[in-house]
Amino acid sequence: MAFVSQFNQLPCKTLALNPPQPQLTSKPSVFPIASIGATARAAAGKSLISVRPAFKVRAVLNDDEWGEDKDEKYGDDSSVAVAEKEEEKPLEPSEIYKLKKALVDSFYGTDRGLRVSRDTRAEIVELITQLESKNPTPAPTEALTLLNGKWILAYTTFAGLFPLLSRNLPLVKVEEISQTIDSENLTVQNSVQFSGPLATTSITTNAKFEVRSPLRVHIKFEEGVIGTPQLTDSIVIPDNVDFLGQKIDFTPFNGIISSLQDTASNVAKTISSQPPIKFSISNTRVESWLLTTYLDEDLRISRGDGGSVFVLLKEGSSFLSL
């Protein structure tokens, strides 16, 4: 390099240092006398070494051969290497997150699986299979803290729920189907919430579960509970209702409906003060099992008797707002 050739032409003087000769005294030496001469010769040899300036490499980002003349120095004027920190890139969503989002997006318009086309069903099955193959919790029953809490049903292939979802009772709507797991007391509570123009109510079943394997739990239902209707904040009667394919117009009966609203409101307040109705479930046919094939902090995929699939989202999950 051009700089090296110019550097070699610089004049360098050799410094010759003559160390003072040690004075010998009559005291006995710790070392043999022969070692004194060897030490003196070694010291003289070291004094003949040429002194050259020291250079250190500095890390730079320029294309220039030696970089910019901006060395950072300490108090002794010695240069130091400087490492430039690269700009951090934002983290991209993981593959599992993308699969979960695609799965939740595919539920749109399916009414929890009641109304789903053949193509959409095939897409959902494929996404579920991919998530199950990437399950971050291989032994869900050993991770009870993740299982613990309220899970809201987003999709199912369980035919037993379809009559409930498709009954289309006038003025009654299924608001939420959920499952609450208490891992400390080993209990499961399944709940269906209904809403109407006057009040809301729920039907709940309580069960005990027993861990049978890292993936499987055995469930035994013990009692059912019909919740006391709770009066809604506002009572609204629609102008018309579709019932059994016919549209019923309530407009001519607005006066009568208004008086009925007051009466119904008083009745609802009286009923709301009553305790819920409980009934025992002792039939052995209500025992079941549940296999959890995917589990994380947001989403759970379980399979029940007959291969039915349940996809549930944890209460508070951001996927519930998609």
UniProtKB/Swiss-Prot annotation:
Residues 1-58 form a transit peptide. Expressed in corollas. Not detected in fruits, stems, leaves, and roots. It is found in: Plastid, Chromoplast. Keywords: Chromoplast, Plastid, Transit peptide. It comes from the Eukaryota. GO terms for cellular component: chromoplast. Pfam families: PAP_fibrillin. May be involved in carotenoid sequestration within chromoplasts. Belongs to the PAP/fibrillin family. This is Chromoplast-specific carotenoid-associated protein, chromoplastic. It comes from Cucumis sativus (Cucumber).
